[in-house]
Amino acid sequence: MTDIPELVPLIKKNISLNVPPSISKIVAQDLDWTTLQSTPSSLRAKAFSFEVIDLLLAVDCVYHPSLVGRLVDTMRYLATPGKTTVVVVVELRAEDVVREFLEAWLQSDPRWEIWSIGEGRLDSAYALWVGRLKEEMQ
């Protein structure tokens, strides 16, 4: 799990209170999308090393246009083709920002497969998408 540095201690506390250590390996660490985006791609692996992520869950991260590109770049960087499932849950505050996010996500890599989930089952104020990067063909 990642967030801004100030919130990581709270995340760690929530993990320790709610997830038995034997169940799974959940790690909380800070990740600044702005720093990631501004780091040259040739240096990213050294500056931002993560193990392969099974599930990338982005909740309530789409709310301001200035963050859309940063979030999409971060999701693309963290997602391993064929291995990482990305789940994005959005509160539908600003239709234009949500549209901008979806367009940016789809355009960030042609291998993304993205599905809308729960239409008609979620509160109308929320939307949920699941995405995966297809593995490269050999």
Which positions does each model-derived feature cover?
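S-adenosylmethionine-dependent methyltransferases
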Residues: 1-138
